[in-house]
Amino acid sequence: MQFRSPLRRFDAFQKTVEDARIKTASGGLITLVSGLIVIFIVLMEWINYRRVIAVHEIIVNPSHGDRMEINFNITFPRIPCQILTVDVLDVSGEFQRDIHHTVSKTRLSPSGEIISVDDLDIGNQQSISDDGAAECGDCYGAADFAPEDTPGCCNTCDAVRDAYGKAHWRIGDVDAFKQCKDENFKELYEAQKVEGCNLAGQLSVNRMAGNFHIAPGRSTQNGNQHVHDTRDYINELDLHDMSHSIHHLSFGPPLDASVHYSNPLDGTVKKVSTADYRYEYFIKCVSYQFMPLSKSTLPIDTNKYAVTQHERSIRGGREEKVPTHVNFHGGIPGVWFQFDISPMRVIERQVRGNTFGGFLSNVLALLGGCVTLASFVDRGYYEVQKLKKN
């Protein structure tokens, strides 16, 4: 005798014998359609589970006193590299003058072609005596302002010119300096004055408000005043102007293009026909942290920025675009990037569109709903067909 379990009375899934089951063509069609719908729903849920989305959060920036890297690549088609300088100033008083060690200057022909690097240096050829030792060149009264690595000595034309600039003395004919005459400074400059220049590199600045600028002439700091000797630029007004192309400008380490839009100033082109012109870019820089989905990849701390622009003639007068606005007279021609630092930090986290548990819950719920709906449709259609036959 077969044992009957007492649990049978709790069975909510009652079965019918095989002979009592009826299979119809409409039921088969509904089953196939339901199966396709289930496959589609499961596929959509899987795509949603695997999808990576970005979650943003804004907090007060906890870091302070850090330094920040500025990466740039800018071309000036109508100014030779010889008279362009890159300087950095900030509100703390830090002044980085005529930065060379992290900035490369590439000479360009009037047609924009790169000129051989072998011809780059003007006024930077150190004199060597017959016995192989470096000579101590005359500073022509500016020995107190000689380069730190050669105290009291100006061994190159650049060293003499720098010393005079620091002393705030005017330079007349550079051929009066032996170093400049020996290096054929004037002749080489004459050959280069129709060229253009590309500047690319990296600047390290304090994480505080300040500016970096690219302007003609050697710069000096006279008290609170920042001064450029623009005589070489002004003497060739017909040849020079501040037209420029910003190929790239970013603050901090770069991000992959897949997670970062282009920087606002990338691809900016400005053209002007007069030499006495000044461009200013006012930049608001926000700390930005990118946290990738993979736990094995470290977060990337960098910066994003927004920018507004202003341009004017240093001669002053009314603006062409807005005649009601009057610009003041004065200033230094050049391209100035005034940056300010926001106290906020934006955190962007990559997360899955759903958890695995959520994925399973959604799939099971949709499966149950789809099967139940299909059974209702099949049962209803079957009953209607049966009534028609009767």
From Swiss-Prot:
Subcellular location, record wording: Membrane
Keyword Transmembrane helix appears in the UniProt entry: yes
Principal place of residence: membrane
Transmembrane segments: 27-47, 356-376
Alphabetical list of Pfam families matching this protein: COPIIcoated_ERV, ERGIC_N
Source species, domain of life: Eukaryota
Keyword field: Membrane, Transmembrane, Transmembrane helix
One GO BP annotation of this record: endoplasmic reticulum to Golgi vesicle-mediated transport
GO CC, alphabetical: COPII-coated ER to Golgi transport vesicle; endoplasmic reticulum; endoplasmic reticulum membrane; Golgi membrane
Family: Belongs to the ERGIC family.
Protein name: Uncharacterized protein C24B11.08c
Organism: Schizosaccharomyces pombe (strain 972 / ATCC 24843) (Fission yeast)
